[in-house]
A protein has these predicted regions:
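Kelch-like beta-propeller repeat domains
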Residues: 1-193
Length: 193
């Protein structure tokens, strides 16, 4: 998430039931994660906390990045372990999970629903940086710059289909560390805050 408007790596837990105080965990490795999906599910050793996808906001001249993987926190070792990237069996492209939801299925699966299209969202959140960079270059044609500014202004005005939200169930197996997709439906194509 964010803290004071900047991406954060902080992670906390509270004992359940009866907890009354937050306990700080080791920081989530890698880039900050805004709008990830999260779930508690079993791996081969017991319950773990899974944090998947999200995006690292732009910081200065560093562009925003949509994460294509996730991390598993194992309470028994108090450590984070990198999950496989979201490249489901048979796919050549990596997927992202920003603004989606996670639901447990059975004893070792997590089903992810919805979320933004990685390429469209990443282009949109980085468009202001691209405009800044191109505005500083006198060789850039004004029409190109105006088109980018128009795209920035119109980004939130398109019909829902234009955004190509994820319309497949994305399923992660916690023991084999693998991804598959299943079932396509426009009803799955949602993004939430």
């Amino acid at each position: 998430g964010q803290s004071n408007g900047k991406g954060s790596h902080a992670a906390f837990r509270m004992a359940y039931p009866g907890g009354s105080q937050w306990e700080r965990l080791p920081d989530v490795p890698g880039g900050a994660r805004v709008q990830p999906a999260a779930s508690v599910q079993n791996n081969a050793y017991g319950p773990c906390f899974y944090l998947v996808g999200g995006f690292e906001p732009r910081e200065g001249k560093k562009p925003a990045v949509v994460h294509t993987g996730g991390w598993c926190f194992e309470p028994r070792t108090n450590t984070w372990t990198r999950m496989a990237d979201m490249k489901p069996h048979g796919r050549t492209d990596l997927m992202g999970m920003v603004g989606g939801q996670a639901i447990n299925s059975g004893c070792a699966h997590i089903v992810f629903i919805g979320g933004v299209n990685r390429q469209i969202f990443e282009a949109a959140v980085n468009r202001p940086l691209v405009i800044e960079q191109l505005s500083a270059n006198p060789e850039v044609h004004a029409d190109s710059l105006n088109l980018l500014k128009q795209q920035e202004t119109e980004y939130l005005t398109h019909p829902a289909d234009w955004y190509r939200f994820n319309n497949e169930l994305l399923i992660y197996h916690t023991i084999t560390d693998t991804w598959i997709t299943e079932s396509q439906s426009p009803l799955l194509a949602r993004a939430c805050l």
